[in-house]
Design a protein with these regions (language model features):
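Active-site pocket scaffolds in enzymes
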Residues: 2-126
Length: 126
């Protein structure tokens, strides 16, 4: 699945739900350049809200609420169904410590070494 160009997320999630076992979106997207800040953008269907996620991690895990239970709800008289939420988690590649191909992209931090990564979430309304 290629999200290099804007896509309607609902269509992608419905396609995945019909095609694959995970019943929605649950993917790790590898970013092209480990030194760049590659933004992830979500824009509401009415173009009134935009979320931009910037990070210098090498990948981003994106998943929808594929298996939401309808109970309990955090808000009285509101039930949530599948795909009512989305999560965007910049980070290292999943299971990289056990995958030699990914070792360079997922360094092991040793005692005394510095760790310097950032994640920025920016919300805009129009």
């Amino acid at each position: 699945m290629d999200f290099n160009k804007p896509k309607i997320l609902k269509n992608a999630v419905e396609y995945l739900a019909e095609t694959f076992i995970q019943n929605g979106l649950d993917h790790c997207f590898i970013l092209k350049d480990k030194h760049s800040v590659a933004p992830v953008e979500l824009i509401s269907s009415d173009d009134k809200v935009k979320l931009t996620v910037n990070s210098n991690y090498p990948s981003v895990q994106v998943y929808t609420s594929n298996f939401f239970n309808k109970e309990p709800s955090l808000v009285p008289n509101v039930t949530y169904s599948n795909y009512a939420a989305i999560c965007i988690e910049p980070g290292y590649y999943p299971n990289a410590i056990n995958t030699p191909l990914f070792t360079e992209k997922n360094p092991t931090l040793k005692l005394g070494e510095d760790f310097n990564k950032f994640i920025q979430f920016k919300f805009e309304t129009y």
